[in-house]
A protein has these predicted regions:
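Short solvent-exposed strand/turn elements
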Residues: 10, 17-20, 51, 86-109
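Short coil-to-beta-strand transition motifs
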Residues: 13-15, 29-30, 63-73
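A residue-level detector for short acidic-glycine micro-motifs
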Residues: 24, 37, 76-78, 98
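N-terminal helix initiation/capping motif
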Residues: 1-40, 108-137
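Short strand-loop-strand
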Residues: 19-60, 91-93
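Short catalytic/binding micro-motifs of nucleotide second-messenger systems
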Residues: 59-62, 83
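Short, conserved beta-turn/loop elements at beta-strand boundaries and strand-helix junctions
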Residues: 25, 40, 79-85
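Short beta-strand-centered aromatic/proline hotspots
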Residues: 33, 71-81
Length: 137
């Protein structure tokens, strides 16, 4: 019997450098101007600025391969110290608020041209789903 792996992401991250501007909602302090990967649901912002998990930020980014810019808000969901070999340096994981359908479609279609970003960590086992699968067998 195989163990089921946990997939916490709703969409595939793509390895692409993205021009952006990310600022705090309060005071409009610049947090970063470059992202290392992008998906329809979020980005990994290259930044050494101190932020809090759960903090709301304002994000503007250029859709790769276009001249179109997308404006949204995002929540800080992860901070990366940049100590792993696979890290590009300090970074901040952002989860976008849902994008309007036109922006979502544009981002999804343009990102298909870029390779996926593979996780640096091993995937976690979803024990609850594995137990449920065993119970059904």
């Amino acid at each position: 019997m195989e163990m089921l792996l946990s997939s916490e992401r709703r969409s595939v991250r793509r390895s692409v450098l993205v021009d952006c501007q990310v600022v705090r909602e309060q005071g409009f302090e610049l947090i970063g101007e470059r992202a290392a990967d992008l998906s329809q649901d979020g980005m990994l912002l290259l930044s050494d600025r101190a932020v809090r998990i759960g903090e709301e930020l304002i994000v503007t980014f250029r859709v790769p391969g276009t001249r179109c810019w997308v404006d949204t808000t995002a929540t800080v969901v992860r901070t990366v110290a940049g100590r792993r070999r696979s890290d590009r340096g300090p970074a901040i994981g952002l989860l976008f608020d849902p994008l309007p359908s036109e922006d979502n479609l544009l981002v999804r279609s343009m990102l298909e041209r870029f390779p996926p970003t593979y996780p640096a960590r091993e995937l976690r086992i979803d024990y609850a789903a594995t137990a449920a699968m065993i119970a059904l067998s």
